Amino acid sequence: MNYQVTGNEYISLPTIRESDGVVEGVTFLYMQVKGLLELRGKAGLIRPYMEAEGQRLPLHPKWTREHCWIPGFTSEERTFRFSCVYLTPIGERGFMVRLVLENTGDAPQQVRFGVEGEWSQTLHEINETTELNAGREAYESGWNHMFIFSQKPGLPLFAFAPCVADPQQFAQIDQHAEWTRDGFAYDIYRVLTLQPGKKAVLDIPWGVGYDGVAAATSAKELLRQGFDAVYERTVRWLAAREKRLADSRLSKILNTNLFFAFFYASGRTIDTEELCLMTSRSPRYYVSAAYWDRDSLLWAFPAILTVDAAYAREILAYVFTRQARNFGVHSRYIDGTMLEPGFELDELCAPVIALNRYVEQTGNLAFAKQGFVQAGLQSVLSRLEAKRHPVIPLYETFLQPTDDMHNYVYLTYDNALVCCAMRALATLLERPELEQAAQRTRQAVYAHCVKEQDGRPFFAWSVDLNGHYDIYDEPPGSLQLLPFYGFCGEDDPIWKNTVAMIRDKSYPLSFAGHAIAEIGCKHAPHPWILSICNSLLSGHAESALRHLRRTAMDNGVACESVNEDTGECETGEAFATCAGFLSYALYCALAR
């Protein structure tokens, strides 16, 4: 099934069905529960509909996505044109639904149109999903002159509410809307006689907050601002950040994935309003709503930095406070506490590389000199030294970039990242001797990680310093990226031999000869979208673009892997951090 997606800093609509326009669920981040909460309905939380002369008319949506982020559909049936737009305004704790019904016939028609739905469950989502059974309630309130849904397992947890009218003396708004509620089921609608050639409009704001007052007034605020005003404000924000390419299809892919990364790989919590990072705010991604240094800082962060340096700085402030205690640990909750244990060397290097990227792009070295940032950098350096071989300047890892167990503990790619991080630390910590340490590690890689096959030297994937090694590659941490991280040049013959080996048909996970000849790995044995990114950044842009054009991924949004022959999504739908790296790689290859 295909889905449309949209969202802002606070609210995500990750499952808008293309077939009928139904919103299956709404998600938001919540710091006290360490992840995502989702409101869902059995047949849909929000279901647009239209009726004529007492008969429900079927919907046949034809979709658009304004500025690659504002989804809407039009459905034509008999003598009616029905349209629906889902708008998640920038900076607002809510979203709006605009419905427009037009009579294209030559006779008046008695019509009814609106949205109906039900709140049937609340889900807590961090990798896995758990239903919250306690404390759901629905009641009517004077704050929105409608109903409020709330969850109070003792103290309030959250509330969710619409608002379609405001009868106050100085701000009266009357859309001639009606509503009904039966328990947790509702219907919000207009009934009228629609004249030929005329349109009727219904705007339905929804708000989310800690309690009923916060939710209701969030919706009322949107109603008072008006759909057109918040739409124009959101469009201006999006247009200011869009990247334009000569190829319209590639431009659409770049910007769709850019905004998906911005709003699904980061967000603000409803309860504390803190900015935080995660793999994906979509529950469709199989490890959603948790934090990985690598995913957030090596993949999503570069894309976000290209469009919003201030937001990128706030991201780094979160990383060097909430997440600093567990730098290098496999995965964490959004509050920084450990989720999955296991040391990953690439993740330990990621905060340093991201910070250095920010400083180089903005020139804001003062941020890096702040005490909490310096403390975080010192902790990275200390942890690095604890993973160094006692004699040879190579650094070990426990888990590989896929989070899978290592074969041998010294990974070439990981040690290339160490070189990159050490060079950055030399500047950021004003420790020039670390530049020499980086050079010694680089020399150690060439001395111990370069092997030979058929008379041609190449970089092994991993080694144990006792003569054992393996030939392998992982798209989340590919040997193709050694020049990208400054370890070697693209003219390095050893690197060129390595890339030729892992892209050759004889390498079982190269998928050479298939329609999408990009590298996979044992974690997901199909071509990875991250491999397309790696190819774009390593001198194989022409073939990468050809492969990208052959896959729809997850309805235009990055996924983990695709079928090598059909291009259909195989694993990892709604992969937000990967979406960031895809948009950044396209930008580097085509726009910069």
Where do the model's predicted regions map?
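The feature captures the catalytic groove of carbohydrate-active enzymes
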Residues: 201-220, 285-286, 331-332, 337-350, ...
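Aromatic-rich carbohydrate-recognition surfaces in CAZymes
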Residues: 287-390, 415, 573-592
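Extended ligand-binding clefts on enzyme/binding-domain cores
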Residues: 290-293, 379-381, 389-390, 408-419, ...
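Terminal accessory carbohydrate-recognition/targeting modules of carbohydrate-active enzymes
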Residues: 1-244
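Long, well-ordered core segments of solenoidal/helical folds
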Residues: 257-269, 307-330, 372-393, 437-456, ...
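C-terminal capping/lid segments that line or modulate ligand- or cofactor-binding pockets
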Residues: 1-36, 288-291, 341-361, 469-489, ...
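An acidic-aromatic substrate-binding cleft motif
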Residues: 220-280
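Active-site-adjacent structural elements in folded domains
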Residues: 82-84, 278-287, 334-339, 401-412, ...
